[in-house]
């Protein structure tokens, strides 16, 4: 990756950056940071993965995906550059290099960059970020054998640099020595250096209070569902303050958080019936979805789940984590992937949990059927994978 960047003129040095890693919450935190910076009047790039509907979603400037023409132009140019290198470039390396080139050419002042996998050896880690953020350490990308949490933490914290501020959302005290062993100008820990002072469900989101190293913020409405999003907002606010070296004006925070859209993350895209999209891509994310449904959508009945999942996910485990059971409906669908789990297998697992289940040929068909089952007062939850969410979002959003 370094060779590819050097042959491209090292565009990653043309802008400042905030680098975000962690098992869950990377995308939401990155979106929140980008919105806070944009509300401050900065020209902001955001690089994320994976995408839901279009690959251009991965590279945004001021909240808008880059054009297909610009995306194709830069990827093709970089593919030609990569051919001159003795080291072949991977798909993700080409996309990352294209993002950095686009940010440089388009005059981005700060890029918010989401790690692809882990961190230390990730393609994104050629930037010298001003602020590094580690959201948490969960069970994704690991077989959970041996000292896996310490190993994963050591890889993720590898995005920290000697002159950067490291903002840590993970609160396990047994991992603190790993974070402290990495080079950084300063370390900030959740629950010690910054914390939530209030967290209440509200209509269309949550009402939060924050204590950060630079100030107190009270009665902040965040347009996002779930207590996990409160933690992401806290991390985003702290990281943004550290980047700017100042507290943020209350009106900037209110604007950024109050107008937030988190695509595919407890995202409500329709009413009558309510239709909610959430990828819930690992056990922790599935449990977070359960909490969101139990708290923010408890009065919505019946609940109809459109489930489309990929191997090697265990449908029974997912159904248990999300809390699907008696009284719920499940419409199981195939997604557009060779790894798609057979809908009948998902339906069998749902029925074993006490739900009423049926199958559909694809996600579009499943959503149409789910809307009928839900009626005007119910809720349709599209989940199980980002593939299912992306296909539904293309139909609905």
Write out the residue ranges for each language-model feature.
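Short internal beta-strands
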Residues: 165-170, 304-307, 328-336
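C-terminal helical cap/extension that packs against the catalytic core
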Residues: 173-178, 182-186, 204-206, 241, ...
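Short Gly/Thr/Asp-enriched flexible loops that form oxyanion-binding sites at enzyme active sites
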Residues: 33, 119-130, 393-396
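Acidic, Mg2+-coordinating active-site environments of NTP-dependent enzymes
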Residues: 94, 106-114, 129-220, 233-251
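A conserved segment at the C-terminal end of the G1
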Residues: 16, 20, 28-45
């Amino acid at each position: 990756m370094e060779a590819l960047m050097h042959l491209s003129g090292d565009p990653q040095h043309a802008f400042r950056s905030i680098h975000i890693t962690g098992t869950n919450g990377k995308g939401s935190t990155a979106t929140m940071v980008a919105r806070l910076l944009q509300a401050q009047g900065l020209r902001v790039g955001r690089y994320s993965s994976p995408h839901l509907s279009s690959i251009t979603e991965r590279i945004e400037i001021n909240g808008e995906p880059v054009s297909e023409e610009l995306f194709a132009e830069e990827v093709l140019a970089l593919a030609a550059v990569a051919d001159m290198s003795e080291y072949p470039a991977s798909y993700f390396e080409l996309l990352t290099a294209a993002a950095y080139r686009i940010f440089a050419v388009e005059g981005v002042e700060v890029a918010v960059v989401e790690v692809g996998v882990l961190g230390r050896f990730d393609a994104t880690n050629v930037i010298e970020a001003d602020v590094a953020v580690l959201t948490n350490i969960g069970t994704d990308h690991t077989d959970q054998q041996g000292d896996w949490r310490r190993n994963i933490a050591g890889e993720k914290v590898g995005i920290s640099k000697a002159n950067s501020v490291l903002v840590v959302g993970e609160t396990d005290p047994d991992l603190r020595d790993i974070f402290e062993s990495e080079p950084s100008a300063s370390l900030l820990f959740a629950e010690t250096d910054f914390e939530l002072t209030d967290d209440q469900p509200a209509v269309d989101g949550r009402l939060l209070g924050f204590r950060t190293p630079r100030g107190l913020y009270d009665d902040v409405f965040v347009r996002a569902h779930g207590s996990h999003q409160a933690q992401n907002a806290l991390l985003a606010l702290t990281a943004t303050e550290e980047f700017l070296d100042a507290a943020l004006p209350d009106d900037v925070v209110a604007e950024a958080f109050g107008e937030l859209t988190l695509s595919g993350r407890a995202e409500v895209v329709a009413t009558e019936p309510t239709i909610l999209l959430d990828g819930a891509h690992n056990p922790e994310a599935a449990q977070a979805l359960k909490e969101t449904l139990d708290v923010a959508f408890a009065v919505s009945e019946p609940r109809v789940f459109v489930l489309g999942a990929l191997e090697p996910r265990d449908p029974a485990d997912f159904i248990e984590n999300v809390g699907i059971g008696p009284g719920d409906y499940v419409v199981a669908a195939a997604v557009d992937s060779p790894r798609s789990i057979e809908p009948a297998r998902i339906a069998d697992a749902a029925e074993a949990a006490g739900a009423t289940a049926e199958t559909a040929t694809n996600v579009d068909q499943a959503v149409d059927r789910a809307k009928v089952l839900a009626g005007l007062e119910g809720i349709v939850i599209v989940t199980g994978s980002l593939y299912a969410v992306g296909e539904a979002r293309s139909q609905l959003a």
